[in-house]
């Protein structure tokens, strides 16, 4: 169960093994928490996560399998980073890029924590993500409303980019990921 939860939290497709003739796809974490003792995933999915675990060793700045799936995976995903409590980033929390630059501060990934990863559907834009995480936040989102100084990472399946939420737009941050 612990392994299934770890992989589910990282974004893996997990199936419950029950008395039914075919496995049941897991759509919520609590299904694993209260579900049967047996789980399965496709061989391709298992191999994908084994490769991500191996790739993580090359990048010590990647803190979790969930983050590795976002930054190194080949699926279309997006992630939201918010400033960690008690980090130097608190000095520029909720401040715009102009303020940060004029005060000689630098945006550093180590000041942030990954608070959400989701599927990047169709032609979803940064503005769409901003609207969703301010008006109709997903139930499993545990951060504050998407705000100035947050970072949105987009993985289109081929390229990964980081974007600073500024006062009225988004600014691409090539230095944030440093992969």
Residue ranges: model-predicted function:
Residues 71-74, 107, 147, 158:
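A generic structural signal for short, non-catalytic loop/turn and secondary-structure boundary residues
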Residues 142-177:
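Short, compact, well-ordered microdomains
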